């Protein structure tokens, strides 16, 4: 049997479950997940390896109309996802309308490559609503194969994965067979801390910070990490730190717990 490999790029509106899907497919938490929009700022590769195939999944930022430079940069990541895909996954959720950007929607319906439309969050619907939604989306995106799924509950995800394997082109692997992602360790430290900031702070604070890991030293039983949280204005420092440092301590404890699971070492 010839080896298969290809790039499978996941696109859709914000908060439809793209990151949850990729994490479920890969079996590791690579993309941060919160209820806030635009939590994915970068394009993240997650790699699934088998003896006969390699799937390189790409989680992209949710599609929006850019209002400032960071959002424009985020949409550039989405544009590149159209250009290098072997298979497109268009992720929608029960009850939503088509993409907020008509240009991207037109690219999907005129795509020359296989398109899988994954209708997510079906655990929030009934059979009648589901059948109606499948018919609606089949009319809107006639070139797509539709898979009703629940990424959170891992329902029908395996069936979608099997179909992806069938559609993969014959190719040698693009990455080493033991690779999980194309991102370095520091990237996941930054993203984990940023996820905890998104979960613990309100209003503009989560979107006004950047995280940079300045030190990552891996020893036999422990990883020593030093990260810096950068804010836009001095007045935001006090909010991040909190009363007697309580807010920042909470972020640190939550991030450390997740990172110890991810790296399987003491942090």
PLM features: residue spans?
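Conserved G1/Walker A P-loop phosphate-binding module
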Residues: 1-82
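Conserved glycine(s) of the Walker
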Residues: 17, 156, 247
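Conserved, well-folded catalytic cores of nucleic-acid-processing
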Residues: 28, 47-51, 66, 81, ...
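Catalytic P-loop NTPase motifs of RecA-like helicase/translocase cores
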Residues: 40, 63-65, 97-98, 125-126, ...
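Conserved C-terminal guanine-recognition region of P-loop GTPase G domains, centered on the G4
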Residues: 52, 76-144, 217-219
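Active-site glycine-centered loops adjacent to acidic/histidine catalytic or metal-binding residues
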Residues: 59, 120, 150
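Canonical P-loop GTPase G-domain recognition
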Residues: 114, 123-181, 185
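P-loop NTP-binding site
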Residues: 185-267
């Amino acid at each position: 049997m010839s080896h298969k490999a290809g790039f499978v790029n996941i696109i859709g509106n914000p908060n439809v479950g793209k990151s949850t899907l990729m994490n479920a497919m890969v079996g590791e938490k690579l993309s941060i997940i919160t209820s806030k929009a635009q939590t994915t700022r970068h394009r993240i590769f997650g790699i699934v390896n088998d003896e006969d195939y390699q799937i390189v999944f790409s989680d992209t930022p949710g599609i929006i109309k850019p209002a400032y430079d960071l959002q424009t940069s985020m949409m550039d990541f989405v544009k590149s996802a159209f250009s290098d895909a072997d298979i497109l996954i268009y992720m929608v959720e029960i009850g939503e309308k088509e993409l907020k950007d008509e240009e991207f929607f037109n690219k999907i319906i005129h795509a020359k490559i296989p398109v899988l439309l994954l209708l997510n969050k079906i655990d929030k619907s009934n059979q009648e609503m589901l059948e109606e939604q499948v018919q609606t989306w089949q009319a809107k995106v006639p070139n797509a194969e539709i898979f009703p799924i629940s990424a959170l509950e891992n329902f029908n995800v395996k069936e979608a994965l099997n179909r992806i394997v069938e559609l993969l082109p014959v190719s040698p692997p693009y990455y080493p067979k033991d690779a999980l992602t194309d991102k370095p360790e520091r990237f996941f430290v930054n993203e984990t801390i940023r996820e905890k900031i998104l979960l613990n702070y309100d209003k503009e604070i989560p979107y006004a910070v950047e995280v940079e890991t300045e030190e990552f030293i891996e020893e036999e039983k422990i990883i020593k990490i030093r990260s810096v949280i950068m804010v836009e204005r001095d007045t935001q420092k006090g909010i991040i730190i909190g009363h007697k440092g309580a807010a920042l301590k909470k972020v640190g404890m939550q991030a450390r717990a997740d990172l110890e699971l991810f790296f399987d070492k003491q942090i």
